């Protein structure tokens, strides 16, 4: 764990939604609660109301796309982003946020980029967080194949971008909810708290 303060440790508790149509949303909720956030599972547009931040978890991107279409969530998700509230996308969540899907982040994701035969692997990556590298777990992961000038690349694996930030949006190709290291979620929650303070 880093020396980052747990959001919610001071002041009013922040509320973070986790898109819960499919994928590893429960594990994200556990980490967020451990760090002091109030968590709501998001399945329909009304669930976005009153949230300070949102997580799009890993899972199966085609299934997630169908769920977003079925529940008419695409425009509400874009509006949530337009309001300046932070969003965190992991693995399939990164794919959902790219140009070819929700169009929220100026990136193009390459699905299953490390090869379908490589089901999972773990490597240390440097994100500039206190405490040193993060043990990043990749499961049939994408990478960022292309990005616009406003996108900051935060980490690479074998020369391929696997973590990035654009404005209030953080995306990673790995599964930070699985490794037992809460620092990436803490980084996101700090941005949520900062955004809420700025909007106050």
Give the positions of each predicted feature.
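Pocket-forming structural segment of enzyme catalytic cores
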Residues: 100-160
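Cofactor-binding loop segments of dinucleotide-utilizing enzymes, especially the Rossmann-like FAD-
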Residues: 21, 92, 174
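C-terminal and late-domain segments of enzyme folds
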Residues: 1-10, 143-200
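Conserved beta-strand segments of alpha/beta enzyme cores
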Residues: 38-40, 135, 152, 170
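N-terminal beta1-alpha1 cap of cysteine-dependent amidohydrolase-like domains
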Residues: 1-70, 79, 182-200
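Cysteine-nucleophile active-site neighborhood
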Residues: 60-126
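Structural motif
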Residues: 55-57, 88, 138, 171-173
């Amino acid at each position: 764990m880093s020396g980052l303060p747990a959001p919610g440790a001071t002041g009013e508790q922040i509320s973070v939604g986790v898109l819960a149509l499919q994928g590893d949303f429960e594990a994200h909720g556990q980490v967020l609660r451990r760090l002091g956030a109030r968590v709501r599972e998001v399945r329909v547009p009304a669930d976005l109301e009153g949230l300070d931040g949102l997580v799009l978890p890993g899972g199966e991107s085609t299934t997630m796309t169908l769920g977003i279409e079925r529940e008419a969530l695409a425009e509400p998700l874009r509006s949530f982003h337009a309001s300046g509230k932070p969003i965190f996308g992991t693995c399939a969540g990164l794919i959902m946020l790219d140009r070819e899907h929700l169009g929220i982040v100026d990136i193009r994701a390459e699905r299953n980029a490390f090869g379908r035969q490589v089901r999972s692997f773990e490597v240390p990556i440097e994100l500039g967080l206190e405490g040193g590298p993060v043990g990043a777990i990749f499961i049939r992961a994408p990478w960022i194949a292309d990005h616009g000038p406003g996108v900051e690349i935060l980490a690479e694996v074998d020369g391929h971008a696997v973590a990035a930030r654009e404005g209030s949006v953080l995306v990673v190709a790995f599964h930070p909810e699985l490794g037992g290291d809460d620092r990436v979620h803490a980084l996101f929650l700090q941005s949520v708290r900062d955004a809420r303070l700025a909007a106050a």
